């Protein structure tokens, strides 16, 4: 139950109607929870990591069916990422993979409780990035530079990643990016979709650069 004041909400007015609406909202929140969805998607079966659930497939998709990674082909398994809800997905990966998981690092938003146990967590600034974003990126960078062709890396991204995974390019400071972001998004209301193309030119990770380390 995610609606913590359900009894209060359904104690007056059209009680039956309110109860139905509360249950619908609760079911919707469960369906959108990264933890719930990842636990449905990720499994370890017969020495393989299997990504599959019918709920994630589009009708007629030519690539339908499970995606499998044979563990004998990999020495280590990592999880990295950044998003406002990244810890829920990362925790699900921890539980689904169990001892198969080597470790990893994710960047989440300031104010969250740290719930991951095996995957490291940095709490950082959103929507305006801060120095903690850089520190989190450095930890991911160190991990990425140690990756070999015998390692399997799962990357979790989502809403907020553009800010949380901020790693300024050479000759640009985090303070400059913070001021730029505040001006564009907080003061001017520029959509994130318009800001992201600019970010690719001033960041060490964006534009696919992280995958090329």
Give the ranges of each region predicted by the language model.
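N-terminal loops that bind phosphate or other acidic moieties
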Residues: 1-157, 161-213
């Amino acid at each position: 139950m995610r609606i913590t004041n359900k009894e209060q909400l359904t104690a007056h007015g059209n009680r039956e109607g309110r109860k139905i609406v509360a249950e619908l909202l609760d079911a919707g929140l469960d369906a959108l929870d990264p933890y719930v969805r990842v636990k449905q998607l990720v499994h370890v079966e017969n020495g393989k990591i299997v990504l599959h659930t019918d709920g994630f497939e589009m009708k007629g998709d030519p690539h339908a069916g499970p995606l499998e990674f044979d563990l004998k082909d990999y020495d280590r398994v990592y999880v990295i990422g950044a998003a406002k809800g990244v810890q829920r997905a990362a925790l699900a990966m921890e539980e689904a993979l169990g001892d198969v998981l080597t470790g990893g690092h994710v960047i989440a938003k300031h104010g969250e409780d740290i719930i991951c146990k095996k995957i490291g967590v940095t709490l950082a600034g959103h929507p305006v990035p801060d120095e903690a974003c850089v520190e989190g990126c450095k930890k991911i960078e160190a991990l990425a530079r140690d990756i070999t062709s015998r390692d399997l890396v799962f990357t979790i991204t989502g809403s907020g990643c553009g800010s949380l995974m901020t790693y300024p390019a050479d000759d640009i400071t985090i303070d400059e990016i913070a001021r730029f972001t505040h001006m564009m998004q907080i003061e001017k209301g520029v959509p994130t979709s318009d800001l992201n193309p600019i970010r690719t030119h001033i960041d060490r990770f964006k534009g696919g650069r992280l995958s090329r380390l």
